[in-house]
Amino acid sequence: MTYSDLLLFIQPFSPPEQWLQRVRQANPAMRVEYHHVEMYAKELPPISKETWAEATILFTWQLFPPKEWVPKLQYIQLLSAGCNQLLGMPLFEDTDIAFCTSNGNHPPQIAEWVFSTFLAFQHHIPEYLENQRARKWVDPPTDEDTEDAVGLRIGILGYGCIGRQCARVAKAFGMDVYAYTLHSRDTPESRRSEDYTEPGLGDPEGEFPSAWFAGKEQLNEFLASDLDLLVITLPLTNQTRGIISGEQFDILSKKKAYISNVGRGPCISTEDLMAALDEGKIRGAALDVTDPEPLPANHKLWGYKNVIITPHCSGNSNHYYERVLKIFAYNLERRAQGRPLVNHVNKALGY
């Protein structure tokens, strides 16, 4: 049989037979080659230059060939939702190759992380765990020492697929949702999501927010809108680096918001964050990402009792690969049908 497509599957896991059957049904003329790599491998697996020259599709995470090796490459599916690892790469910036993220894979588990850490803070769970380890029964000083989530306002900085799932969970807790996007979404059509969304999850129609904000000119207005919880889900670009800094912490101090960062560490100025914590401008923070990352053992940020830090693991799930493969198969089917790919990275914007 003559094959019109060659897919190089470069991952730490092999493609399941059921998945292969699905994609071959969509495109019988596609050949799939699996090449194993360790999760954090730094070098490409041994693949001949002849094979690279024939490849039309690549499934990878952080390993990429030089653009000169892949004259026929048309589509790269990333294992990750973020794509800042591509910035400055000629394969990304100087070609017409379509890059697609795995947006839609992470929202369930990351939204769970956001609310498990926020509710743990609200309900004093870290303190109770310390008491438990010390075998101490310490009664709360009052029955009103806990603020539940009903009626609180969550501001979601970056209303993509992760932010939309956070909104869904927030609404279930009875919270009010405000959304901020980098670009204006002032019509019902513009508020619809173009990313892959699992049925029954997220906010594909953009129905949950009671207020929308957009652009640099409305950032501080958004932060000044009496937010109880600020969730940052932004990618890292030149526009978003340091988007929450000293001026923004001053604004957030009005309500003493709690901050949750599941985007990228450099979206927050670490020095300004620590100053805000020292001065009591915010109630606390939950950080799955930091700047620097990994956070050095002697870093001051470790020492705050009102800060929860985890090692960039909020996206971990035993359904991770299953969901990524579902997104990838969906895109391969759309490609075979001549339809636009979902989660297509905008090279001009960098996400």
List each model region and its residues.
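C-terminal helix-to-coil terminal segments
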Residues: 22, 100, 104-113, 127, ...
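Glycine-rich, N-terminal phosphate-binding loop of Rossmann-like dinucleotide-binding domains
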Residues: 62, 80, 232-234, 262-263, ...
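Phosphate/diphosphate ligand-binding glycine-rich loop within oxidoreductases
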Residues: 52-133, 143-147
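Short, conserved loop/helix-junction motifs that constitute active-site signature segments
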Residues: 66-73, 89-95, 249-255, 276-281, ...
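Rossmann-like adenosine-cofactor binding region
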Residues: 184-300
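Conserved beta-strand positions in the Rossmann-like core of class I SAM-dependent methyltransferases
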Residues: 178
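N-terminal glycine-/charge-rich "phosphate-binding" loop or analogous flexible N-terminal tail
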Residues: 1-55
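Glycine-rich NAD(P)-binding loop of Rossmann-like domains
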Residues: 129-165
